[in-house]
UniProtKB/Swiss-Prot annotation:
Classification via PANTHER family: NEUROPATHY TARGET ESTERASE/SWISS CHEESE D.MELANOGASTER (PTHR14226), TRIACYLGLYCEROL LIPASE PTL2 (PTHR14226:SF66)
Domain of life: Eukaryota
Pfam family, one: Patatin
Official protein name in the record: Patatin-like phospholipase domain-containing protein YALI0D16379g
Transmembrane segments: 223-243
Length: 818
């Protein structure tokens, strides 16, 4: 059975290696084309016995397939900043901390990560000042050898003195000037200094493990307690896995039989959303879920209020009572109004919800459009109304989690939403998910539709290196991948040196990348066009993917107005955002008023614990018409109890700091942070995917990833459709009303000027000349990035057309006499 299960991976091992080697060569070529040796597309050995290609893979259909968008000058600067060395230590002679005096920091144009936030000391020894900001391993070894030599000399002197004392001799020519106690103390200090290597970070800062004084009890009980808790967690995890296997067997044996099993197979085999909808409706009829939709009564929403408001809004719209309708909408357009956006309403059927809810959503959308187009409401009032609608209703965001190469499943999620025109304007990504988010936010809709195809695998070449090469790098640097090489290969996804601000101006989508500072006590930053508008996107992608042991922390790079590339945030280094904020829901709410988060979660250590005891959106409980529990009440209760017990002990380990800070990181956050959103998508992960968790996909694999991602997104699209139906109408209203600011007529300007001068000097008979400039024009939507605490919609500012002037008539234009 195992042989059959993994057999489909074996034929692709050869082509994948060949593809990686060819891409490594063609990427450095001037043309950057990856298909020069394969004009017909496909792998070189993907041919049948007749010599024809098995699959017609054609990379030429992808826009910019022959471009790399690499700016070598930027990469050279990036590499130079990463390799910048410290001022060498002039003397390796060790000095105690009491002999160190504070020294003013060296004035530099910027602060690099190697001397960021680190105290500086001046070591005074023989009137020589030494910058002992960081002592390398070589210096420590030299000090250790120095003290060993001193100790050997002292021992020889002592033994020689004892021998001569017995012989009655006087004096000792080899007598040292240094006291015996000082030498022994220095040797002991040097030994401690050598062992302190393991308690230092990479930038030389010593980890203070006992900063708050844990006491001797902590050191005695820490490791035994951690051992017993770890064994208990291992036992609980084993029991949890057994419960999940029993629940899956229970559902497959008792529920999915006969016609139900056939309909379920058709549902899972749907390649398009239309096919999936038809299969879902057939399955609902078979399971008896269709009857639930007709009955408006349900305890998870206020069906009485919704029914009354639907009739009232329709009546006011048909009677053309715009003022009354706009007042009612102010109270109705809110997030999850009367429970109509509750996920439970969409978890009872495979497709659809209550008919009353669908009618309300349709009527509400028509009412919003009617208010926008009604001539009975002036433009100023419309602008205020839609500003309130936007704030009350909020915004939606797509959050793509990390997860190594599992993150390529996000491609299918984005494709499914894009095909139905439901892709949110705000997209965030972390680690591997940041790469997909960057691709979605730097390309237009039409470009994305051409890019999200199986041939996209030819452009993903991050893991091209052979085993001996990356093992040697890992042994030498502590990281499997090279930062500069990854920066070069990610430039295609970011269109070169594009910044967050430039991406927003090009597509109107807001890219967010979560990164964590290398300092464990500094706050996390969510990079976007507000917090870091001029930051290069490819540098944020590297920082967000810098998992310890995989990629070393890197600096964010900033583009100046002159086009120069310099370090961002004083040159401090950043690492994988999944370590602390995989899903930055709170930050998105702060910056963009996001209150509906659609999360695509592919982290394997989190996805294995996903379990919806009462069903989830588009996936109801498979028995008892959706009214029961998955696996029965006993199975669901046991699953929840074990999972809560595991979480409790993880919180205990974090609270009492039992887990060591390996590579200066609190690893309990990997399990204890928030990983879900308003709606959470869990793409299906196969056991064979773990073998390629740090590997590049090939076209057949990419085709499967796109299929699985779309299959996961299909059940959630109806919920997202109802949400975006209102949100997009409000967004269109905001864009339309902000461009309807009344343009001043010449008579208005004359009246204003007359009033101003009459109030300032009523008795003056002096006539003034005035030039009326051309009408001011607004910037196009999506180009302004101004923001304020009171408005998250970033209204475009007004500016004058080129050539307009406020010069008087005597200087340039004919006068207008008032």
């Amino acid at each position: 059975m195992l042989k059959l299960k993994f057999r489909w991976n074996k034929p692709d091992d050869g082509p994948r290696v060949k593809r990686q080697k060819s891409q490594q060569l063609t990427l450095d070529s001037p043309e950057g084309s990856e298909t020069s040796s394969r004009p017909g597309g496909g792998y070189d050995n993907d041919r049948d016995v007749n010599g024809t290609f098995k699959r017609p893979w054609d990379i030429t259909k992808i826009p910019g397939y022959n471009q790399t968008y690499v700016n070598e000058a930027s990469l050279d600067k990036f590499a130079a900043y990463l390799k910048e060395e410290e001022v060498p230590v002039e003397s390796s002679t060790p000095v105690s901390s009491e002999e160190m005096l504070p020294l003013e920091p060296v004035q530099k144009e910027y602060i690099t990560s190697k001397h960021d936030w680190t105290p500086v000391f001046s070591v005074l020894k023989n009137n020589n000042s030494v910058n002992k900001r960081k002592m390398s391993h070589t210096a420590l070894k030299s000090d250790f050898k120095h003290y060993l030599d001193m100790y050997d000399k002292e021992e020889k002197r002592r033994r020689g003195k004892s021998k001569k004392d017995k012989e009655g001799s006087e004096g000792d020519k080899t007598k040292t000037k240094e006291p015996k106690e000082l030498v022994r103390k220095s040797v002991f200090s040097s030994i401690l200094g050598v062992f302190s290597i393991f308690s230092k970070t990479k930038d030389g800062r010593k980890l203070k493990r006992d900063e708050i004084g844990e006491g001797i009890g902590f050191w005695l009980m820490r490791w035994p307690a951690l051992f017993f808790i770890g064994m208990w967690l291992l036992f609980l995890t084993t029991i949890y896995a057994s419960v999940r296997v029993l629940v899956a067997g229970y559902e497959n044996i008792l529920t999915w039989r006969g016609k139900r099993a056939k309909l379920r197979k058709v549902l899972r085999g749907a390649r398009t959303y239309e096919q999936w909808v038809q299969a879902a409706q057939d399955l609902d009829v078979e399971l008896g879920n269709a009857e639930w939709r007709e009955n408006p009564k349900f305890g998870y929403y206020d069906h009485v209020t919704i029914s009354k408001l639907t009739k009232m809004v329709r009546k006011l719209r048909l009677q053309d009572q715009a003022e009354d309708l706009s007042n009612i909408l102010q109270g109705c357009i809110k997030n999850n109004f009367a429970g109509t956006e509750s996920s439970t309403l969409y978890s009872q059927t495979y497709y659809g919800t209550k008919k009353v809810v669908e009618q309300w959503n349709e009527e509400l959308g028509k009412a919003v459009t009617y208010v926008l187009e009604s001539p009975k409401i002036d433009d100023e009032e419309k602008r205020d109304l839609f500003r309130l609608y936007s704030k009350n209703f909020g915004k939606s965001a797509l959050c793509l989690s990390g997860g190594g190469c599992f993150a390529y499943l996000h491609f299918g999620i984005v494709k499914a939403m894009l095909d139905q025109d439901l892709l949110p304007q705000i997209i965030s990504g972390t680690s591997g998910g940041a790469l997909i988010a960057a691709l979605a936010c730097t390309r237009t809709d039409e470009e994305l539709r051409q890019i999200l195809v199986p041939e996209l695998a030819y452009k993903i070449t991050a893991c091209w290196e052979p085993f001996p090469k990356w093992v040697f790098r890992w042994w030498r640097t502590g990281a499997r991948f090279d930062s500069v090489d990854w920066a070069r290969r990610s430039c295609w996804f970011t269109l070169g040196d594009m910044t967050f601000k430039e991406a927003y101006q090009r597509t109107g989508r807001i890219l967010n990348v979560s990164t964590v500072p290398a300092d464990p006590h500094s706050p996390v930053i969510l990079c976007n066009y507000i917090t870091s508008p001029d930051c290069l996107i490819w540098s944020a992608l590297l920082a967000s993917a810098a998992v310890p042991g995989i990629l070393n922390p890197v600096m964010l790079m900033n583009k100046t107005k002159s086009g120069d590339i310099v370090p961002f945030s004083f040159g401090s280094k950043w690492k994988d955002g999944s370590l602390r904020t995989d899903i930055p829901v709170d930050a998105l709410n702060t910056y963009f008023n996001v209150n509906c988060s659609i999360v695509s979660q592919v982290n394997p250590h989190i996805a294995l614990f996903f379990y919806a005891p009462r069903g989830t959106v588009g996936r109801p409980v498979s028995h008892r018409k959706g009214k029961g529990w998955r696996g029965g009440f006993l199975g669901a209760a046991l699953e929840s109890m074990i999972k809560l017990e595991i979480r409790k002990w993880l919180k205990f380990i974090k609270a009492v700091e039992l887990l060591p800070r390996f590579v200066d990181q609190d690893w309990t956050n990997v399990w204890l942070q928030r990983f879900s959103g308003s709606v959470t998508l869990w793409p299906k992960i196969h056991l064979a995917d773990f073998w390629h968790i740090l590997g590049d996909p090939w076209p057949e694999k990419m085709e499967d990833l796109l299929y699985r991602g779309q299959q996961c997104a299909f059940p959630k699209l109806l919920f997202l459709k109802h949400r975006m139906n209102i949100e997009k109408r409000i967004r269109n209203g905001r864009q339309a009303t902000r461009h309807r600011k009344r343009k001043l007529e010449e008579t208005d300007v004359c009246d204003l000027v007359r009033k101003t001068f009459s109030e300032s000097d009523p008795d003056s008979d002096v006539k003034h000349s005035f030039v009326f400039p051309a009408l001011m024009a607004p910037r196009s939507a999506g180009t302004d990035i101004s923001s304020s605490n009171s408005d998250y919609d970033h209204e475009p500012q007004w500016e004058m057309d080129e050539g307009d002037s406020f010069l008087t008539a005597d200087e340039e234009y004919p006068t207008t006499i008032l």
